[in-house]
Amino acid sequence: MFQAQSRRSAGEALRRTLVAALTVSSLAWATAASAQSAAQRAVDAAKKSCAGKTITIVWEAGLQSLDPLNFSGPKWEQLTGCKVKVVEVPTAEMFTKIMQEYRAGTGAYDALNVVPAWMPDLVQAGALENLDPYVDKNGFRAELQKIAPTYRDNQMMVNGKIYGFPDDGDVFLFYYRKDIFARPDLQKAFKAKYNYDLAPPKTWKQFDEIGSFLTETLKSEGIYGASFFREPPYAMLMFQERFRVEGGRFFDPQSMKATVNSPVGVRVLTEMRNENRFMPPGVEKFGFVENLAVFLDGKSAMTISWPPYGRFAAGYLSEEKALSWVPKSKIAGKVGYALPPGGHPELALGFALSVASSSKQKDLAYLFIQWLNSEEISSQRVQLPYALRDPFRDSHYTNKDYMAKWPDAKDYLAALGQAAQTGLLDLSLIQTDKYDEALRQGISKLWAGGDPKAILDDVAKQWDDTTQRVGVDKQKAVYSAWAAKSGAYPKK
Amino acid sequence: MSQRPGALAGSDGAAVAPPTRRGVRTRGFRLALVAPAIFVLLLVGVFPLVYLIVVSFQNITMTDVDTGFQGLLNYRLLATDGRLWEALLHTLIFIAIALPVELIFGLAMAQLFIERIPGRAVFVALLVLPVLVSPIVAGANWSLMFDNRFGPINQIIGWLAGQETALLWTIRPTLVYPAILVAEIWQWTPFMFLLLLAALSGVDRSQLEAAAIDGASWWRTFRKIVLPAIWPVIAVAVLIRGLDLFRLFDIVWALTRGGPGTMTETISIFTYVKGFQQFETSYTAAVALLIIVLLSAAVFWALKRVELAR
């Protein structure tokens, strides 16, 4: 009996030892796994099935696509054996291409770059894969939480499900000439005229006063108070921001009737046209490049644009071959960065990474976009001088390497970090492009001399017609979900 | 006379011999030879048309999952769509101005170059160059020409006016139609010129010489001899250019994209925007059908006129 008892206690000890050993090794494995980065997890998972395969990804043509062509594509192939084929498509045709391929069911695209405002349309059509199961399977949820709040909370989900990883911190930033604003003669004259200090404007009223003052004073030196891109596709986004900053609402949430033609809208349009008077002649035709050329040439004191303006103005890697088209900056070291008047910049366009629902290799496509979007790889990608991907993760704004890129890079990143807290979403509904198109036409009529009230009445009518065609209740549900997002309207 | 058993009556009542087995085989062989061509024609011509009609009664919007039939809805929308009819009006305005101007300029140039002047071959070759340029490239070039800051047109006007000029050719409502028409007429007048030069070369010289001997004025000779001789060619040239102008797209797109607002939007741009930017596939099918009907009627009428001219 004693022997039997002794054997039992020995067996029990062995069992306990084994359980303890198993527990320790499991914990060690789990610790090691969690310590492993999301990028590495994607690489390890892809290696198992990737060899000899090719992933096709849709990317915006031009500088943007140099990222997968020169950097991320070759690197992914080196790490996993999986080739990356990049289909370059101009922005204006991306939605069409994606939808056409999806409808044709060719499975030609595996991964996609999509503008977040398109997501409701693409999801409703069934073109995007729900990424939640992949995120959980590959342990990416924690890293997704580290995306800057505005992008994470507004540009990732439709109907509570993840359909894309925000991957480009596109936002309108305010750029001004520090040297001009610091001139004692201008400061004195401005204070005498307006009774407040000459500083980056906090409101659009201040912007108008500073802009007209600087043009009056500096035009003889060939400098205008401000210049903006005014071509309708850009000005439409600027209107969306300013309209909301001034208190405007796009729709009545109960009836879904358009309220864009409210007095706020009319005032904003009127002011926008009046501002052209203190901007360079022909500003109505300025696009991204024209406005950039004027600003880098030192011919305007203030402007608003996407983040690359800040890098180009600083002359950051201006010797880069791909950037040879960028005019040489005459204002390096003289540019200050701030939020646009009102403090709620438009998250104009941007890109999210998605998986095509018609892809025949969704797992591989997912692993590629997880790797691209991860902390580790994205921080390298946003520093590529040529690729136009802008910071979008909390860590990007405090990245030591990035801060050392040029003397004012720290201020630049700080301004972007602020914008990532308060940015406003582009309007995103079913058939968004129809609403946008009506606004673009309205802006075009505004520059042609049309009456702001009549223009906005027509825009509102077109919006109401589109809403009727889509279905009031259906659109109302989408609008309510959009309006409930933190970046839809400024907090009162 | 009684008919022989098995014989068939002809149209004149005369007996016709029944087809022999060899004859039937030959006819079958001939049919077999043309059948693939007919099949291809049906496939590429009739099937798309039938499918277009079917789609125009559906609700395909590319982003909408419910694509069922919805009767005449698209046609009702079409009737009340002000933008569509405005686009049609803009197209007709372009045709009404560009077509006669191109014809008159083309004819004048052809008259000039019908004479054996020195360097004629070189000049003709140079004048024809615009036709060889892709319309979208021509539009992009004219966009640069009209640019308010760097374009030579504003600079030339500035020199003439003695002060800096920054006319916004593609934005101001009063300037945008002239800008488009200048580009369009520049590109396609040489086409008219070529056709009419060929037609003028074919006019009977003896008749012209006889008219000259009889002391007929230039205008009378032109009206009574030259114009009737080249009229069929003019009719065809006008028909071709008229149809081309009806589908005017590239130059307008490159210069204004249909703006300001929709002020210069042509029916082709409208169709493109609806079909390929907004994905209103079924509605666009209804618009396409309307265009087919309008164009068919115009072509039918024009061909009858050509026939009458002969």
Q: What is each of the regions a protein language model found here?
A:
Chain A
Residues 35-56, 77-78, 159-161, 214-222, ...:
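Immediate post-signal peptide segment of exported/extracytoplasmic ligand-binding proteins
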Residues 36-49, 116-173, 205, 235-238, ...:
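Hinge/lid segment of periplasmic solute-binding proteins
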Residues 39-43, 329-338, 383-446, 475-492:
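Long, aromatic- and glycine/proline-rich binding clefts that accommodate carbohydrate-like moieties
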Residues 41-49, 63-83, 179, 439:
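Short, polar/charged alpha-helical segment
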Residues 71-147, 164, 184, 294, ...:
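Extracytoplasmic "Venus flytrap"/periplasmic binding protein-like
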Residues 154-168, 172, 199-257, 300:
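Extracytoplasmic/periplasmic solute-binding protein
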Residues 160, 266, 270, 276-281, ...:
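Extracytoplasmic/periplasmic substrate-recognition and gating elements
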Residues 204-214, 248, 253-285, 332-336, ...:
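Glycine-centered hinge/linker elements that transmit conformational signals in sensory
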